């Protein structure tokens, strides 16, 4: 069934292709991107798709310029984590030892992070783990190691102000070389410590088209601006602002383009038509802005925004996503934005810059397109693919199938639907321990304990634990019996030893005359009596 539908779709496309020989799309400028898992609570929706100006409007173009930033769309850096790893020995007076391990989060110092970062770059940074226990009798002793860990972490860049932007930063942005995060035990350090002058950034040439009603008097409220980076910018919400010594205007989305004071429309100077921007106005980028902040009141953009939010609702409910759902999350106009894909069942995103490209149709035999203009040279627009069921998937739902390379959003726009566009796949956000709550500080007061890893707590069990095998127990029994017999023998022999030690005594009433020596002195009659 699927193959027959695919064949019919390809046949249908073959008839439609001549009518759409130059299909204009907004697509990532690089053929490969650096993908990261989408974390929970992410609901970024880009600015709506490009508007088509009314046929009755007169269009004129003028050469302008826009800052592209002194840094790329993302900046390399490192997260520095600090914790105290503690081994506690509770040595009781009656014998047992209680050994516990715990981890305590602490705020790293600048010197600790610099030292650890130098070791990390040289490949000598190691985690010592828990220290060995140090036990003192009848006391509680702590042994601790200060463990500093370094992990690479890329952040976005606000091209205009030179600020780093990331959900981990407090408030979502940072302009220092040592940035606090929502986790008190972690700080972010940029890989390049050099401070850049904002006005030292490059300004790229840009052709801006201005549309107006030629039947009415030219005023700011009746002007619409358009460029390859700006889809539909209303003059009514545009103001005049000097930036780095250049005259220019700031669009409603916060982006700035130069506008020469000599530029005219129907012999009327364009720059004075706009009012001055309020004092303290900053030039901003909308890359990290929330979808609700860039949503305008025009009905053409409400649909895109609703479809995008509906897709995030599916992600939140952990429902499977189709390639068409992914296309709703992507930017529809040139400029900085985010691209989405599915990698091993995980919804992933990447920072990118969308550029205008022209393709032969919504279904291609090869992933090739023309840049700069419809008359340009065709080149590969994408080379990075991931497994997606029986097919492969690229950015924003772009499918690599047996029937060709399909762009779901553009196929639906032409009323072409097939089963492959609705192929479902698990695409859940990653449960990362660092959830992006940029407006609050994460609670790092919790301490991690690994429980009692010491010896027995019972003195009786402690004694019986001395004998770990039956041989030792038998030997102990024999020794005990011998000791008892020895003690009994000593007690029995003690009276005998005491008797032999006594001295002889003379009997009372025995005269010494009975001795042999005295008999010779006795008379005979006395001897006879004796």
From Swiss-Prot:
Attaches the virus to host receptors, inducing clathrin-dependent endocytosis of the virion. In the endosome, the acidic pH induces conformational changes in the glycoprotein trimer, which trigger fusion between virus and endosomal membrane. One of its GO terms (biological process) is virion attachment to host cell. Keywords: Disulfide bond, Glycoprotein, Host membrane, Host-virus interaction, Lipoprotein, Membrane, Palmitate, Signal, Transmembrane, Transmembrane helix, Viral attachment to host cell, Viral envelope protein, Virion, Virus entry into host cell. Glycans are attached at residues 184, 344. Changing residue 502 to K: In strain: Isolate CIN0360R and Isolate CIN0360V. Glycosylated by host. Palmitoylated by host. Changing residue 367 to M: In strain: Isolate CIN0309R, Isolate CIN0318R, Isolate CIN0327M, Isolate CIN0327R and Isolate CIN0331M. One of its GO terms (cellular component) is viral envelope. The gene is G. Residues 495-530 are intravirion. Residues 1-21 form the signal peptide. This is Glycoprotein. Residues 22-473 are virion surface. Changing residue 30 to S: In strain: Isolate CIN0360R and Isolate CIN0360V.
């Amino acid at each position: 069934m699927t193959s027959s539908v695919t064949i019919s779709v390809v046949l249908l496309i073959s008839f439609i292709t001549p009518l759409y020989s130059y299909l204009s799309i907004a697509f990532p400028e690089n053929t490969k991107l650096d993908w990261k898992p989408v974390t929970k609570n992410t609901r970024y929706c880009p600015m709506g798709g490009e508007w088509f100006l009314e046929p009755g409007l007169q269009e004129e173009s003028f050469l302008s310029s826009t800052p592209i930033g002194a840094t790329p769309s993302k900046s390399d850096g490192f997260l520095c984590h600090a914790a105290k790893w503690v081994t506690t020995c509770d040595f009781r007076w009656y014998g047992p030892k209680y050994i516990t391990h715990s981890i305590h989060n602490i705020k790293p110092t600048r010197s600790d992070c610099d030292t650890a970062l130098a070791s990390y770059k040289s490949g000598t940074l190691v985690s010592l783990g828990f220290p060995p226990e140090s036990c003192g009798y009848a006391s509680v002793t702590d042994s601790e190691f200060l463990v500093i860990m370094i992990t690479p972490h890329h952040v976005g860049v606000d091209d205009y102000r030179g600020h780093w932007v990331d959900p981990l930063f407090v408030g979502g942005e940072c302009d220092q070389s040592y940035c606090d995060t929502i986790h008190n035990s972690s700080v972010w350090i940029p890989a390049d410590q050099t401070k850049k002058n904002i006005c030292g950034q490059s300004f790229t040439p840009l052709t801006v088209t201005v549309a107006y009603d030629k039947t009415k008097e030219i005023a700011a409220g009746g002007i619409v601006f358009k460029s390859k980076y700006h889809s539909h910018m209303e003059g009514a919400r545009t103001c005049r602002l000097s930036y780095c010594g250049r005259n220019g205007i700031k669009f409603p989305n916060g982006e700035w383009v130069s506008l020469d004071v000599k530029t005219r429309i129907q012999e009327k100077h364009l720059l004075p038509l706009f009012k001055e921007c309020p004092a303290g106005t900053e030039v901003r980028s909308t890359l990290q802005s929330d979808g609700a902040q860039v949503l305008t009141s025009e009905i053409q953009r409400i649909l895109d925004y609703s479809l995008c939010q509906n897709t995030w609702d599916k992600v939140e409910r952990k429902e499977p996503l189709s390639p068409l759902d992914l296309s709703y999350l992507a930017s529809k106009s040139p400029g900085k934005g985010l691209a989405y894909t599915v990698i091993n069942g995980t919804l992933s995103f990447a920072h990118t810059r969308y550029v205008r490209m022209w393709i032969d149709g919504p279904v291609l035999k090869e992933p090739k397109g023309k840049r700069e203009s419809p008359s340009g040279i065709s080149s590969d627009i994408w080379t990075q693919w991931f497994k997606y069921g029986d097919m492969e998937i690229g950015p924003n739902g772009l499918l690599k199938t047996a029937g060709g390379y399909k762009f779901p959003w553009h196929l639906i726009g032409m009323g072409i639907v097939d089963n492959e566009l609705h192929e479902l796949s698990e695409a859940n956000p990653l449960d990362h321990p660092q959830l992006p709550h940029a407006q609050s500080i994460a609670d790092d007061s919790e301490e991690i304990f690994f429980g009692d890893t010491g010896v027995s707590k019972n003195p009786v069990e402690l004694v019986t634990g001395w004998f770990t095998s039956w041989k030792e127990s038998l030997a102990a029994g024999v020794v005990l019996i011998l000791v008892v017999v020895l003690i009994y023998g000593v007690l029995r022999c003690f009276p005998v030893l005491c008797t032999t030690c006594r001295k002889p005594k003379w009997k009372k009433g025995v005269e010494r005359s009975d001795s042999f020596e005295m008999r010779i002195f006795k008379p005979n009659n006395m001897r006879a009596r004796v």
